[in-house]
Swiss-Prot record:
Solcar repeats: 19-102, 125-206, 221-305
Signal peptide: none
UniProt entry tagged with the keyword Transmembrane helix: yes
Entry GO terms, CC: mitochondrial inner membrane
Family: Belongs to the mitochondrial carrier (TC 2.A.29) family. SLC25A38 subfamily.
Name of the featured protein: Mitochondrial glycine transporter
Annotated function: Mitochondrial glycine transporter that imports glycine into the mitochondrial matrix. Plays an important role in providing glycine for the first enzymatic step in heme biosynthesis, the condensation of glycine with succinyl-CoA to produce 5-aminolevulinate (ALA) in the mitochondrial matrix.
Length: 315
């Protein structure tokens, strides 16, 4: 039995509407909004833990839970986070599909229409490159929202509103302040996204093979394979790239002190040790694994269903 046969996915008739940008943008937006809203507390705790080596998870959680409005405080920064992740995911998935489709057409590869994936199948190198390029492009566009989100979530600042945070950043640092930490963000996101897509596609093939080799069991559904593959891929890619995330957080919180990536790394290691580069790793793995698994599963399922629906209309 082939790997594709284990996926419980209907045959899709390829039509012009199958590759519509609107499908990928809408599916990416919905998947990003869903994961960001559900997992905002983990993102907020990660920011608080990473802002200083002296901050640890349990005291941070206790402090928030003992505050007058613990639920509200756990979801503090949800709006900028939802905007950043929602529209960032929409831009990312749209760009990723465009890049991968372009490579398929350029190389004359026949598109795969009977698998669990909404994306064309490419080589490992192409998976790495397209994932990295799409993520950096989306990250640059959404960078101002990211900076405002990090400042608003942190307890270093006493911003009462998102507008106030943005206005203060522009007033004290200029528009350049809205792009603080972009170098570290790109250095984190490019390898993370590239590795993620690479691991994700490889894991899906492996899980499909394991499922097909067990003839006495019911084949795994595409959504199950996508979810497990997404979580495992995120865990691996997150561990490898966490130092860049820790540096990025410091640069966005205190750009005047840390200045640039190299200076930030040097100061962090001198003052807090190498361990500071892996601050918030547990929280980041938890959030990334869940958010990536959820976002990619929702995205792929929405695209596959959209293609089935529009493909049948085109008959």
């Amino acid at each position: 039995m082939s790997n594709n046969a284990v996926y419980a996915v209907p045959q899709v008739k390829t039509t012009k509407t199958s590759s519509k940008t609107t499908f990928h943008f809408t599916a990416g937006l919905f998947s990003g909004l869903t994961s960001s809203i559900l997992l905002q507390p983990a993102d907020l705790l990660k920011t608080r833990v990473q802002q200083s080596q002296n901050a640890s998870l349990l005291p941070t959680v206790k402090a928030i839970l003992s505050s007058p409005n613990p639920i509200r405080n756990l979801w503090r920064g949800t709006l900028p986070s939802a905007l950043r992740t929602g529209f960032g995911s929409a831009l990312y998935f749209t760009s990723l599909n465009a890049l991968r489709t372009g490579l398929v057409q350029t190389n004359g590869i026949a598109p795969v229409t009977n698998s669990s994936s909404a994306l064309p199948k490419l080589s490992n190198t192409a998976n790495l490159a397209t994932g990295a390029a799409a993520r950096v492009a989306a990250g640059f566009v959404m960078m101002p929202v990211t900076v405002i989100k990090v400042r608003y979530e942190s307890d270093y600042y006493a911003y009462r509103s998102l507008f106030g945070a943005g206005r203060d950043i522009v007033r004290t640092e200029g528009f350049r302040g809205l792009f603080s930490g972009f170098g570290a963000t790109a250095a984190r996101d490019a390898p993370y996204a590239g590795l993620y897509v690479l691991f994700y596609e490889q894991l899906k093939r492996r899980l499909a093979g394991l499922s097909s080799s067990s003839s006495d069991q019911q084949p795994l559904k595409s959504s199950s394979i996508n979810f497990v593959s997404g979580g495992l891929a995120a865990g691996l890619a997150t561990t490898i790239t966490n130092p860049f995330d820790a540096v990025k957080t410091r640069l966005q919180l205190m750009p005047g002190r840390y200045g640039n990536m190299m200076r930030a790394v040097r100061l962090m290691v001198q003052e807090d040790g190498v361990r500071s580069l892996f601050g918030g790793l547990g929280l980041r793995i938890t959030r990334k694994a869940l958010s990536s698994a959820l976002a990619w599963t929702v995205y792929e399922e929405l695209i596959l269903r959209a293609e089935v629906q529009w493909g049948s209309k085109g008959e």
